[in-house]
């Protein structure tokens, strides 16, 4: 929790749910999130489309999109946090007003399935968004990131974005970061929401998925000629793969597709872990071999 003497009033934050609606049992977590954000001087404003009403839907695609746009249009809202995940986020893409988003000074935060919205925003507007799940801040594992979140969001620090990496090949990643969840990113293939890959650093991570699934996702990216266009790859965590020790690993699989001269780095701090940090999609990132590995040891 932020020191009350140093607390900065940050205004209001819109809370949306563009993907699957929240189940009833999430009520306590969301109340804890409300209390936490209020406690650091950030007033949360929840859309009416938060909880599941019809199967996993909190509202229609148009309703969920309009609830997001209402926060972009509201001058009292300074930032927007999406607290959902699952499968439904790409439903809202046709109903978003990208001109309004482009002209706003507000940054969208979300993760997992919100990879679709985040990359669509970049593709259509050139604006960056933050790949991060704010609900993690009130979990037992994620509470350790509260100080970093507060310093980054309220005091213009960078703690939440400072990630450790280990290079698998090459010594530096530099460019505009795109991507996120590998499965969800591929939903955009062939649509107007697919980002330009030229010269970009591609972030890939996943919650579920075994070796065959990772192989087919990477193969699709390869068939889209993504690996011929990008300047480098940043691998986040692949939860199911790493938890079960599946082989070959994603680090091994990726080398079948990328040129040996393409820089590839691994971080344990971006992905679905409750204690994950954040990255800005659509913004410049520079990572080099002087970063530390997961054990805190200097690389390179």
Language-model regions: role of each:
Residues 1-76:
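ATP/NTP phosphate-donor binding region
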Residues 46-48, 110, 230-237, 265:
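Short internal beta-strands
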Residues 146-222:
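ATP/pyrophosphate-binding catalytic subdomain of soluble kinases
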Residues 237-300:
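ATP/nucleoside-binding phosphotransfer catalytic cores, i.e., glycine-rich phosphate-binding loops
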